[in-house]
Design a protein with these regions (language model features):
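Helical element adjacent to the flavin cofactor pocket in flavoenzyme catalytic cores
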Residues: 20-28
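Short, solvent-exposed loop/turn elements at beta->coil junctions and helix N-caps
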Residues: 35-42, 126
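Conserved C-terminal structural/oligomerization subdomain of aldehyde/semialdehyde dehydrogenase
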Residues: 44-180
């Protein structure tokens, strides 16, 4: 067992993970990094799955759902960064978001009030959805909000947790690597 291997919550989540990957292909997408269910010693529960990367389109039904599984959907856009922001904001969820760009103006727009409408917005680094010390709780249909604790007054303002990676490296959450 690898230290990065973590189980999904239960067998129902494993089934949802498998169905999500099937749905990507059914809708015309491509699986770039194949996932799958891990088995053998240390994986007896049947709840361990491999991360997957899928190329999809913004109008795919599966992209509009929150799958709670280690699946990264790659969505292409063209034109100004506002087009990418529109694609990203056009879902009902709003926990976390990220953009990869070398353009500082694009990065700043993504992090501005005209940009990502998620609770966490990162530039040039992925997101785990639970950055330590950040404004946790999500936006839109994600999470239960932040009003149950010391963040009660903050409901009256729009907050984001932002990260900009200025290096040439692209570190992934929890040290995950995809050797392609």
């Amino acid at each position: 067992m690898c230290i990065r291997d973590r189980p999904v919550i239960d067998k129902l989540a494993v089934d949802m993970y498998s169905k999500a990957l099937d749905k990507v292909v059914e809708e015309g997408g491509n699986i770039i990094v194949e996932g799958g269910i891990l088995d053998g010693e240390g994986y007896e529960s049947g709840c361990y799955v491999k991360p997957a990367i899928a190329e999809a389109k913004p109008d795919f039904h599966i992209v509009q759902e929150e799958t709670f599984a280690p699946i990264l959907y790659l969505l292409k856009y063209s034109g100004p960064v506002a087009n990418a922001i529109e694609i990203q904001n056009n879902v009902t969820q709003g926990l976390s978001s990220a953009i990869m760009t070398n353009n500082l103006k694009e990065a700043e727009k993504f992090l501005s009030a005209a940009g990502s409408d998620c609770g966490i917005a990162n530039v040039n680094i992925g997101t785990s959805g639970a950055e330590i010390g950040g404004a946790f709780g999500g936006e839109k249909d994600t999470g239960g909000g932040r009003e149950s604790g010391s963040d009660a007054w903050k409901i009256y303002m729009r907050r984001q947790t932002n990260t900009i990676n200025y290096t040439d490296d692209l570190p992934l959450a929890q040290g995950i690597k995809f050797d392609l």
